[in-house]
């Protein structure tokens, strides 16, 4: 999605009502951000939006990119936000062999997750339960503690690396990925070094 360098439009300050709506949407999608929300989106902060190509919008606070959105879909975290709060987002892990493909903007395929170096959520993990979101985070071995459904946002970690390398939306649920072991898993991801990562937001 952001393989090429980007030229963003001038930033526009969001109204207080729009900021409140985005804050609620962010917490609904990523409940584990709740303890950090005042740091990310302070109530008196000046959140700005920047229009990007292909109907994408980037949200910026004090020139720091926070999250982006494609044509009204779920808010997706910018990798710089993920690196600040890595355990607040659902994650999967690719093996070493898949890293160079993901960092070139290729579609993430299932074999990169089902191999020995890959990692998917805990087998049999329960779906997200309303009111119990805070209990469904990371377990001891670093796996996400619930299965993730098709269409959910996901952070992509990499074998042997501490920081996330990409963010995207699941083209298949994690239970399906385990069962089939093949096919596309994440398409059009935002990845380290892409146009969104390199975009000047000051």
Q: How should these model regions be labeled?
A:
Residues 1-202:
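Polybasic, low-complexity RNA-engagement segments
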């Amino acid at each position: 999605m952001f393989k090429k360098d980007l030229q963003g439009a001038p930033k526009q300050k969001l109204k207080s009502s729009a900021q409140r709506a985005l804050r609620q949407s962010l917490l609904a999608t990523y409940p584990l951000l709740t303890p950090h929300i005042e740091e990310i989106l302070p109530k008196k902060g000046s959140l700005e939006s920047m229009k990007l190509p292909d109907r994408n919008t980037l949200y910026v606070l004090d020139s720091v990119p926070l999250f982006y959105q494609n044509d009204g879909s779920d808010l997706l975290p910018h990798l710089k936000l993920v690196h600040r709060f890595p355990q607040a987002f659902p994650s999967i892990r690719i093996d070493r062999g898949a890293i160079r493909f993901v960092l070139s903007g290729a579609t993430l395929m299932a074999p990169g997750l089902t191999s020995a170096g890959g990692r998917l959520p805990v087998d049999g993990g329960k779906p997200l339960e309303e009111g119990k979101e805070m209990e469904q985070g990371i377990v001891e071995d670093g796996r996400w503690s619930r299965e993730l459904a098709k269409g959910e946002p996901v952070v992509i970690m990499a074998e042997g690396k501490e920081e996330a390398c990409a963010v995207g939306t699941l083209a298949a649920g994690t239970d399906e990925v385990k069962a089939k072991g093949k096919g596309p898993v994440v398409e059009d991801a935002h990845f380290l070094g892409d146009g969104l990562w390199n975009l000047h937001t000051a």
